[in-house]
Structure formats: structure tokens, C-alpha cells
Regions:
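Acidic/histidine metal-binding catalytic segments
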Residues: 52-60, 97-111
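Short helix-capping and hinge/turn segments at secondary-structure transitions, especially at repeat
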Residues: 69, 91-95, 99, 112-120, ...
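An active-site-proximal "capping" alpha-helix that borders the catalytic cofactor pocket
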Residues: 40, 81-96
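Acidic/His-rich, divalent-metal-binding segments that scaffold phosphate/diphosphate chemistry
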Residues: 1-83
Length: 216
């Protein structure tokens, strides 16, 4: 793995975020996006190591996949386009690293399609390219996101019946997500591990709720 190239990418990402007028006015968003980028890059690294992909390229793609968030996103279209815009921002930097044109295109294609599976340039949809979106999706089911989700939906303010209904629906949705296709066997295994972790958590929560109104 080319640690010097990765260090340069980290510096580029941090500087881009530091130069962002939007992030200067929204430092919490900046901090979250940076932390998220590292988490996705580490998942991409794990997939690349297991699948025999270029690990440095996978880490770079993970670090830069959300770089477009340096720009304020007002509309839903802005958010849907942030993969393509991110690839546009990343390309000159990647070319400056001296990467081969095919490597630049593959990284940029992975960044471009990670939101809605669409790019604005032609390239082969390789398992490497799918790794960016797969890593991003796997991240959505890490431990901290449980806390964030419950806080966002104001779970603590719900009645017991509302909590039970929400947890039941969540478990059903999590089980349905097991059928989702991913680009590699490694990503699929990580995906299933995360889903099982979540299902186990919510099943334990439901068991606690069942013990909350009567002696069983």
C-alpha cells in the first residue's frame, strides 16, 4: 500500500474541507463528513485487501467519495449529484498524483456511481468501482449509527407501544435488506454481519420491552 499517496490524499481532503465556506459556517457537518470519510475508507481497505484490489486506490476512493460536501447542497438534486460532482473535484488531484489514466477513471467512476449508480462518463462497472458504494452502505450499519438513528427519530420520547411498533418494523426491514446485491463476496459478508448485529440489538431491545408490563 502506498502510504505516501494516501497521506497526500488525506491532506487534500482536509485542506479542501478547511477551505470550504460552507464547512467554516457548519463545523459540525465538516467534522462528521471527515469522520465518515475515514470510516468508509477503512471499510473499502478491508474489502480491497480480501479481494486483491489495489488497496491504496480503494482507500483513496473511500476518502474522496464525499468530497463534494465541501459545497453547500440545497436541493435533493444536489445530494443525488454529489457522487458525480465528487468525481469531478477529485479527478485533477488524482491526475496530479501521477496515477495511470485507467486508475484515475476507475476511482472516479466508483465515486461517481456511489449514490445512485449513475456516472456522467463511460467506464466499466468493475467490482472495484462497486466497492465505494458498498463500503458507504456497510458504514450505515455501524454501532454509532444506532445511537444517531434513535436520537434522530426521538425514540426516547415514544410510548412503549410506539417503540415496539418501530422496533418490529425495523427488524423486518433489516431482514429484507439481506437480499441486497453487493459487488464482492467480502462486501456481502460484511453487509450480512452488520445486519445481524443490528437485528440482534433490536431483538434484545424488544425482549426488554416484553418484560416491561407484566411478570412473565
Amino acid at each position: 500500500m502506498d502510504n505516501e499517496m494516501i497521506a497526500g490524499t488525506e491532506a487534500f481532503l482536509r485542506q479542501t474541507f478547511a477551505d470550504s465556506a460552507y464547512f467554516r459556517n457548519n463545523p459540525k457537518d465538516r467534522d462528521y463528513r471527515l469522520e465518515h470519510s475515514y470510516r468508509v475508507a477503512n471499510i473499502a481497505k478491508n474489502i480491497a485487501e480480501a479481494e486483491g484490489f489495489d488497496v491504496a486506490h480503494a482507500v483513496i476512493a473511500g476518502l474522496l467519495h464525499d468530497i463534494a460536501y465541501c459545497e453547500e447542497m440545497v436541493t435533493r438534486e444536489d445530494h443525488m449529484n454529489h457522487g458525480r460532482r465528487g468525481a469531478e473535484i477529485a479527478r485533477p488531484f488524482l491526475e496530479g498524483l501521477g496515477l495511470a489514466p485507467d486508475a484515475v477513471n476507475e476511482i472516479c467512476y466508483g465515486i461517481a456511481i456511489h449514490v445512485d449508480d449513475r456516472a456522467d462518463f463511460e467506464w466499466e462497472r468493475t467490482p472495484f468501482c462497486e466497492t465505494v458504494g458498498d463500503a458507504d452502505n456497510i458504514y450505515r450499519f455501524d454501532a454509532y449509527r444506532i445511537y444517531e438513528t434513535l436520537q434522530f427519530i426521538k425514540f426516547s420520547e415514544m410510548s412503549l407501544d410506539e417503540k415496539k411498533a418501530k422496533v418490529t418494523g425495523t427488524i423486518e426491514k433489516l431482514n429484507s435488506l439481506k437480499e441486497m446485491k453487493l459487488g464482492t463476496a467480502t462486501a456481502k459478508n460484511l453487509w450480512l454481519q452488520r445486519l445481524d448485529y443490528y437485528i440482534g440489538f433490536y431483538e434484545k431491545m424488544m425482549a426488554q420491552f416484553e418484560n416491561s408490563t407484566a411478570i412473565l
